[in-house]
Amino acid sequence: EYGFTAYILGQDQEEAHKHISLFEQHLNALKHQLPQAQYYAYLSSVYTYKLGLDKKHLMKYASGIFDNIKRAMELDDEDPLVLSMQGNVEFYSPFGSKKKALEYYLKADSIYHQMPNTAELWNVRAVQMTIVQCLAKMNRAEDAKQQCMQFLEEEPDCVIFQNLLSELTNPSNN
């Protein structure tokens, strides 16, 4: 639900509202089964999605985002999911830092690569995608291309990386 909710948020606000509520219900039901750091990281994303639908409550939702990701990092700052969520907060926050975001994403990717059986985890590809996007936003297009090609070596059929590489190679076609 985490990834789909982010996707639907930009497509259909009414449907997104339903998915945010469902995501929050499921997250609360799993509170004691998930590692606590991951629970708080996901809870931070719930507030992010709510903010995406309702900017009038910026302070309330921003507080929920920052308080929960801070709690997650205090609990486990070596969990790659938590690191990637902290990276997202840095990347997307108006006062965030792309440089810090990149550091969190790279650390998460490094940890994922040390773990067994992560090749099929979509979170790994999501982190790698955001590394490329972050480098591009930092005006480091050549680094972004190199990183994208490296990720394509790991996952040659990954359409996301093929598309990103095409965008980076042919920016005038976008």
Predicted regions and their residues:
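Flexible helix-coil transition and linker loops at the boundaries of alpha-helical arrays
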Residues: Q25-Y40, K70-E78, D109-V124
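Terminal, low-structured helical/coil segments at or just beyond the last alpha-helical repeat
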Residues: T118-N174
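Alpha-helical membrane segments in multi-pass integral membrane proteins
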Residues: K98-A108, R125-T130
